[in-house]
């Protein structure tokens, strides 16, 4: 959906990445000149939500002040939920150097909400060390009504592939459609409604440093994902009581507590720790207009930095519509072996390096130093293409989660019926063209 700046306000969004926002659902609900007055307006409670250390450098410090009907501490004790699908352990299956690809999973046959529909495919690191990521799919056909969720282990980058999501959060509401993403910060409580009845997509659970926009270097002051295109919600609250359930993900396990009111009761807030969404179709793609296919880092949307300069814990990269103008060059992504590990998904269309087998809703994994690249059909076609004319790739959106650590599949992923056992054959048809007598 393309909205003007005026329409953004009417739809309940504020523009900018990690801005210092201020919003209130009732006039005068935000205290003036202080964060924690002796008595907050409307009888609200003041509560700070911290996403970074108190002493983090100001440029990286994230926190928001919430003014809510009841404090977040009001709930019954948590008890652990026994389940085996939404995981943060990645040591149950030895990682394989084999290239792996999965067909799109089927929708559930029984009523399943967003939280119950999450299944972990792979990951590395863990929440205890606050580094690495979990990579999940979600498959849902039922809205969450009297159930709420928060993740204490990491922020969640959610990539819808089929069906819209209405993210009703403590800080406001975000409607997200395929080819948009939404990021829910660590600790923010929310529920998910399904406007289209069912939904499918991908999640990157970031255990490390918060996602940020990459530096642009010699690109200059504009390009890639522009800050103004990130949208955060305006304050919106629920004031209802009942027999509700609060689910938490904590140290790799799910926990449930009873709660007698909706925890989405924030009437006003200010700060820079907030959910946000971004339309991937707004990405300003940079590419070569002379020769060669540049490195895929030019398609970087968000990064989670590590302690090593130039090395990220997670890179979120997209491959959308774009012009290819390189002359006398092989235009698809080239054959590659990478120190990093790559998990890919396809939101819509066809990925330009794979003519067949990689379907929307599917996924692939190419781990550290595992060879990958265009399949035989793509190679032959691109090798014979007329590169004197530009070519536009249209109606596609693929993405990649790239990490420096090996991405370790879970038992579910390794044993899934959707795992394509014949994936390796897409390269077996590559012909030998070498002739030492002909250059």
From Swiss-Prot:
List the GO terms this entry assigns under cellular component, sorted alphabetically. Answer: cytoplasm
**Annotated pathway, please?**
Amino-acid degradation; L-phenylalanine degradation; acetoacetate and fumarate from L-phenylalanine: step 4/6
Any idea of its EC number?
A: 1.13.11.5
A GO BP term, please?
tyrosine catabolic process
The organism's superkingdom is given as Bacteria
Keywords, A to Z, come to: Dioxygenase, Iron, Metal-binding, Oxidoreductase, Phenylalanine catabolism, Tyrosine catabolism
Q: Which GO terms of the molecular function aspect are on file? A: homogentisate 1,2-dioxygenase activity; iron ion binding
Q: Which reaction does it catalyse?
A: homogentisate + O2 = 4-maleylacetoacetate + H(+)
- At which positions is homogentisate bound? 351, 372
Q: Which residues bind Fe cation?
A: 336, 342, 372
Q: Please give the InterPro entries that the UniProt record associates with this protein.
A: HgmA_C, HgmA_N, Homogentis_dOase, Homogentis_dOase_bac, RmlC-like_jellyroll, RmlC_Cupin_sf
Q: Where is the active site?
A: 293
Look up the record and name the cofactor or cofactors this protein needs: Fe cation
Q: Which family does it belong to?
A: Belongs to the homogentisate dioxygenase family.
As for what it does, the entry says: Involved in the catabolism of homogentisate (2,5-dihydroxyphenylacetate or 2,5-OH-PhAc), a central intermediate in the degradation of phenylalanine and tyrosine. Catalyzes the oxidative ring cleavage of the aromatic ring of homogentisate to yield maleylacetoacetate.
How is the subunit organization of this protein annotated in UniProt? Hexamer; dimer of trimers.
Know the name of this protein?
A: Homogentisate 1,2-dioxygenase
- Species for this entry: Cupriavidus necator (strain ATCC 17699 / DSM 428 / KCTC 22496 / NCIMB 10442 / H16 / Stanier 337) (Ralstonia eutropha)
What is the taxonomic lineage of the source species? Bacteria, Pseudomonadati, Pseudomonadota, Betaproteobacteria, Burkholderiales
As recorded in Swiss-Prot or TrEMBL, the protein's gene is named hmgA
